[in-house]
């Protein structure tokens, strides 16, 4: 439908024929229309009635008075909010240009009447240009569906087949044909090794491992069964030895070329360290075409293609499956550490289970800690199990009552706290089993205390009774460390705490004591926020007479091994993220450890000599701990996984997820599908849209993927890739203990006046690149000055390269260089980058309101679903009061003690109008408004609102075409529709000033605002 805008829309706002419609109301409310508007104001003034001067009417009593004042306050707040609304306006020159542009584009296209799908709103939130689907005849719906299906099939070659395949992918897709010459060569190499001194020395070590004595038994079981479960304690050698047993057995039988083993690891650090260890045991270097190598995201040292062992992260196999659904070149797949139950390994188990019938020759080995091996065997049709005994020294365990009795601990503050306030129901994790256990705990408490009095001193029982077990008692830990240092033998101490705050506080507590300030102690905090330079000290043995104290999160349970630990202090809590499907919010809280966690922690103490493990919970609590942590799939959003299921062609999302070992709830699955439909990544048949295909191929969650695509389309690629990498990995800032305030100040310095955590990371990254170009010393000084991790920055740099490869392969850019000038025409414009952030992260929007009722200026922040929320203390916006606009876009919202926005960026009205949800034009009494999803509301003259809405429609059409057939925008072709529409939108975003009633152009400043 084409408009002659000057014919249909008068300069004063409404259709010429509408008389008192838009035109009349515009004149009445803004053009000095004193009658209606002022009259209503006067009428409202008398509303106080008999109360006089705004007091309540005299006939009201009790609760009625309170309700009257509440209603009055609500009206006052609503009016204040109306007056604070930003005004969307444009000068006459731009208005004229956009009218001409729209007229030209719409005439040129002579658009067909088929409704366009909005990228930013659910399909049923159209712009009102098409009858709702439910009102259409079935025959019409069927024809439309078939047409769409045919279009999609025609475009499939573009979408499914990436143009670019990297070296690692080529390696993975290599065919595995038997090769007699290679078989002989591998056999000769293995025989030769047996005379190599390095190999012989390593062999002596291997022979001492419990797994080595079971070599024949293990190999026979794997040979004779398609699936085998191997369980074993830490230190038994299952991860390093089982793969070697299989490979050497094949080589010795003259079938080495037919053996290609892939072993998955849950973490990057373990994939690398295990591969390097196995290579060393085989007297080889890791990778370089030898027998053993690794592949993790953005890093690989690949082994030879046949007769080899590849250690890789679980995500690598899932990506591999996209190109080779049957893993046809793999002879053995070993899934290690499956007891951890992370999301990817649970999914891979189900995929592999389905694969067994297609690949009867494929051997599957599942490796787990001892505790739950039976469950995995049952899942794979009661396949055989074999157990390898552990190799640890005995460890003496102490529970809370033992510790208090042993060190005669008395809390400083003797305040009785309710034992039953939360108990097992830590945070907001509403699980029935937790509630049931809490009820049992409460019921058994009196009997437990009676039993304690028979075995422990009265003072110990009194302390146990008074302690608040919701909190980790850091004073008790400090006292226990002091006791170990003074009374026990030498040996490193490892303390497990739930999070950064506890680690930081305990460190300060120890350093406040003169004893720990001496050079006889090395205290090392171990956390992802800590600089990695400090953390390398963890692995170094200390000189005689020096005691190492490591304060860590659960990263020290399995990911790393600290050899010299003799004493473990188990704080009893672990930070867990959960997803509340009812309120659509992530929550993070300190939960009680599981029995499996406790066992792992205990095992850390007995690796080199007999050890001691101190658990900071009582024996009643110990008896009620869960066997394992809740599997990740039951406590995380599922959007990224749903896209993976579709790209791997695993069938219906709900059907596939229902077959997992622990299926997620229907609510969680439906919520994720709904979000993906709103994002236009899935259609109503739950099939991938063209956008969905691109998002599924990007190794990030969907909102970040969408941001990456927009960064390419709007030619601000480099900064947007920096933001995307940091959101999907982590930001590069570190917080050394004792330097928190200085670190915060440096971060704010990098923020400049952007009012954006995301642009702060961009500025930090740019500074690092410049420093790096000048040399290593400058890079080191820069990172030191601004509290940045050079390792993390390097990882972000590598990830940006990977994202650019994906974009090149899909056709969105013409170079794999993130800094290619053609992809960065708008990269210096902060407002355009903010618009792209908004395009990716919408609808994660928060509203800012200035709170003037306080003595000092403050802002309150709200979201649509949560009401009042808080900006996280680490955000650069936490103390900000001078915002240009009233809206923030954020990535992570999480409930801990409060609901926090962890990162946010201030965005302008045009960002939200062009890249937000469904647009509607409304009237709010005397105010003309334009709204996004009916809650983000701006003042706007009707003619401007209609121009914006039409321009937005053109943008949606253009974007849909770009996604279906990607190619870079040709900015030199200024006459092209693409260039004209995008340039007009960019121009509006770039030139938008702070648009509140205080700084409007003269034609807006009239009686309404004075």
From Swiss-Prot:
Region of interest called Required for the pre-miR-134 transport, as start-end residue ranges on this chain: 1-107
Positions of the UniProt region annotated as WH domain: 631-700
Region DSM (DHX36-specific motif), annotated ranges: 56-78
Keywords: Acetylation, Activator, Antiviral defense, ATP-binding, Cell projection, Chromosome, Cytoplasm, Developmental protein, Differentiation, DNA-binding, Helicase, Hydrolase, Immunity, Innate immunity, Magnesium, Metal-binding, Mitochondrion, Nucleotide-binding, Nucleus, Phosphoprotein, Repeat, Repressor, RNA-binding, Telomere, Transcription, Transcription regulation, Translation regulation, Transport
EC number: 3.6.4.12, 3.6.4.13
Region: RecA-like domain 2, residue numbers: 389-630
Residues holding Mg(2+): 337, 339
A GO MF term: single-stranded DNA binding
Binding residue positions for ATP: 235-240, 559, 604-607
Activity regulation (UniProt): ATPase activity is enhanced in the presence of homomeric poly(U) RNAs, but not by double-stranded DNA (dsDNA), double-stranded RNA (dsRNA) and tRNA.
Span list, region Required for recruitment to cytoplasmic stress granules: 1-54
Function noted in UniProt: Multifunctional ATP-dependent helicase that unwinds G-quadruplex (G4) structures. Plays a role in many biological processes such as genomic integrity, gene expression regulations and as a sensor to initiate antiviral responses. G4 structures correspond to helical structures containing guanine tetrads. Binds with high affinity to and unwinds G4 structures that are formed in nucleic acids (G4-DNA and G4-RNA). Plays a role in genomic integrity.
Annotated domain remarks: The DHX36-specific motif (DSM) form folds into a DNA-binding-induced alpha-helix that together with the oligonucleotide and oligosaccharide-binding-fold-like (OB-fold-like) subdomain bind to Myc-promoter G4-DNA-containing structure in an ATP-dependent manner. Upon G4-DNA-binding, DHX36 pulls on DSM in the 3'-direction, inducing rearrangement of the RecA-like 1 and 2 and the degenerate-winged-helix (WH) regions; these rearrangements are probably responsible for the ATP-independent repetitive G4-DNA unfolding activity, one residue at a time.
Assembly description: Found in a multi-helicase-TICAM1 complex at least composed of DHX36, DDX1, DDX21 and TICAM1; this complex exists in resting cells with or without dsRNA poly(I:C) ligand stimulation. Interacts (via C-terminus) with TICAM1 (via TIR domain). Interacts (via C-terminus) with DDX21; this interaction serves as bridges to TICAM1. Interacts with TERT; this interaction is dependent on the ability of DHX36 to bind to the G-quadruplex RNA (G4-RNA) structure present in the telomerase RNA template component (TERC).
Annotated protein name in UniProt: ATP-dependent DNA/RNA helicase DHX36
């Amino acid at each position: 439908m084409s408009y002659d805008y000057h014919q249909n829309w008068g300069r004063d706002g409404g259709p010429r024929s509408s008389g008192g419609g838009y035109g009349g109301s515009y004149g009445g409310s803004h053009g000095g229309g004193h009658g209606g508007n002022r009259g209503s104001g006067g009428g409202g003034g008398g509303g106080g009635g008999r109360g006089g001067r705004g007091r309540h009417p005299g006939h009201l009593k009790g609760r009625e008075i309170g309700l009257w004042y509440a209603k009055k306050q609500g009206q006052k707040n609503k009016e204040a909010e109306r007056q604070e609304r930003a005004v969307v306006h444009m000068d006459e020159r731009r208005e004229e240009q956009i009218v001409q542009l729209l007229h030209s584009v719409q005439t040129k296209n002579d658009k067909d009447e088929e409704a366009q799908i909005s990228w930013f709103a659910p399909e049923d939130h159209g712009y009102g240009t098409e009858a709702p689907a439910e009102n259409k005849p079935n025959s019409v719906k069927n024809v439309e569906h078939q047409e769409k299906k045919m279009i999609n099939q025609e475009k499939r070659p573009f979408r499914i087949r990436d143009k670019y395949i990297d070296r690692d992918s080529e390696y993975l897709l290599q065919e595995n044909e038997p090769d007699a010459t290679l078989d002989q060569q591998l056999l000769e190499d293995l025989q030769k090794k047996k005379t190599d001194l390095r190999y012989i020395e390593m062999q002596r070590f291997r022979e001492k491992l419990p797994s080595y004595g079971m070599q024949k038994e293990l190999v026979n079981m794997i040979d004779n069964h398609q699936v085998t479960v191997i369980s074993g304690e830490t230190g038994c050698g299952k991860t390093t030895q089982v793969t070697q047993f299989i490979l050497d057995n094949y080589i010795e039988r003259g079938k080495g070329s037919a053996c290609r083993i892939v072993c998955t690891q849950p973490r990057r650090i373990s994939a690398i360290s295990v591969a390097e260890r196995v290579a060393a045991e085989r007297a080889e270097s890791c990778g370089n075409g030898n027998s053993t190598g690794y592949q993790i995201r953005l890093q690989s040292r690949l082994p030879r293609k046949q007769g080899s062992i590849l250690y890789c992260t679980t995500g690598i196999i899932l990506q591999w499956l996209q190109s080779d659904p049957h893993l046809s070149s793999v002879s053995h797949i070993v899934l290690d550490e499956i007891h951890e139950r992370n999301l990817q390994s649970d999914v891979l188990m189900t995929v592999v289970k389905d694969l067994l019938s297609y690949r009867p020759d494929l051997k599957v080995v599942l490796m787990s800690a001892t505790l739950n091996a039976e469950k995995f065997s049952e899942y794979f049709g009661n396949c055989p199990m074999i157990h390898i005994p552990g190799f640890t020294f005995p460890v003496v365990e102490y529970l809370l009552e033992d510790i208090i009795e042993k060190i005669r601990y008395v809390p400083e503050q003797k305040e009785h706290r309710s034992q039953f306030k939360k108990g097992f129901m830590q945070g907001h994790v509403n699980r029935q089993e937790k509630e049931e256990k809490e009820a049992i705990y409460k019921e058994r408490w009196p009997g437990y205390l009676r039993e304690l009095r028979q075995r422990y001193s009265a003072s110990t029982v009194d302390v146990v009774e008074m302690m608040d077990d919701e909190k980790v008692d850091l004073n008790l830990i400090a006292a226990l460390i002091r006791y170990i240092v003074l009374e026990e033998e030498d040996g490193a101490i490892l303390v497990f705490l739930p999070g950064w705050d506890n680690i930081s506080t305990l460190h300060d507590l120890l350093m406040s004591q003169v004893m720990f300030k001496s050079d006889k102690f090395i205290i090392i905090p171990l956390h992802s926020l800590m600089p990695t330079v400090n953390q390398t000290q963890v692995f170094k043995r200390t000189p005689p007479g020096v005691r190492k104290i490591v304060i860590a999160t659960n990263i020290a349970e399995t990911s790393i091994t600290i050899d010299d630990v003799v004493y473990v202090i188990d704080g009893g809590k672990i930070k867990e993220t959960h997803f509340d499907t009812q309120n659509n919010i992530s929550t993070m809280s300190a939960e009680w450890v599981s029995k499996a966690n406790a066992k792992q922690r205990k095992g850390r103490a007995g690796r080199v000599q007999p050890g001691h493990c101190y658990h900071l919970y009582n024996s009643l609590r110990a008896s009620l701990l869960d066997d394992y942590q809740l599997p990740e799939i039951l406590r995380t959003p599922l959007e990224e996984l749903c896209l993976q299921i579709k790209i791997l062609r695993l069938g219906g999302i709900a059907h596939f997820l229902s077959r997992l070992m622990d299926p997620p709830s229907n609510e969680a699955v439906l919520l994720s599908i709904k979000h993906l439909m709103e994002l236009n990544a899935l259609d109503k048949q739950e099939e991938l849209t063209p956008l969905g295909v691109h998002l599924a191929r990007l190794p990030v969650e969907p909102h970040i993927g969408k941001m990456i695509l927009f960064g390419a389309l709007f030619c601000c690629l480099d900064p947007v890739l920096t933001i995307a990498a940091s959101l999907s990995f982590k930001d590069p800032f570190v917080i050394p203990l004792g330097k928190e305030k200085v670190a915060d100040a440096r971060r704010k310095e990098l923020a400049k006046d952007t009012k954006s955590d995301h642009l702060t990371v961009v500025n930090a990254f740019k500074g690092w690149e410049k420093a790096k170009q000048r040399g290593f010393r400058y890079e080191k000084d820069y990172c030191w000055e601004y509290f940045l991790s050079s390792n993390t920055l390097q990882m972000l740099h590598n990830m940006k390269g990977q994202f650019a490869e994906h974009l090149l392969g899909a056709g969105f850019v013409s170079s794999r260089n993130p800094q290619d000038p053609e992809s960065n025409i708008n990269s210096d414009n902060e407002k355009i980058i903010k618009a792209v952030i908004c395009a990716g992260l919408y609808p994660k929007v928060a509203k800012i309101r200035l709170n003037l009722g306080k003595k000092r200026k403050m802002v309150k922040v709200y979201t649509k679903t949560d009401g009042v929320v808080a900006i996280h203390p680490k955000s650069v916006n936490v103390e900000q009061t001078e915002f240009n606009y009233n809206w923030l876009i954020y990535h992570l919202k999480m409930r801990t003690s409060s609901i926090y926005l962890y990162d946010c960026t201030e965005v302008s009205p045009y960002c939200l109008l062009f890249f937000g949800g469904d647009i509607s034009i409304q009237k709010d009494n005397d105010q003309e408004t334009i709204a996004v999803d009916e809650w983000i509301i701006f003042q706007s003259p009707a003619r401007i609102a209609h121009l914006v809405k039409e321009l937005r429609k053109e943008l949606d059409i253009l974007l849909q075409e770009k996604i279906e057939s990607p190619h870079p925008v040709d900015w030199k072709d200024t006459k092209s529709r693409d260039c004209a529409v995008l340039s007009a939108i960019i121009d509006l975003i770039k030139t938008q000033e702070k648009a509140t009633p205080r700084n409007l152009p003269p034609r807006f400043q009239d009686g309404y605002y004075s």
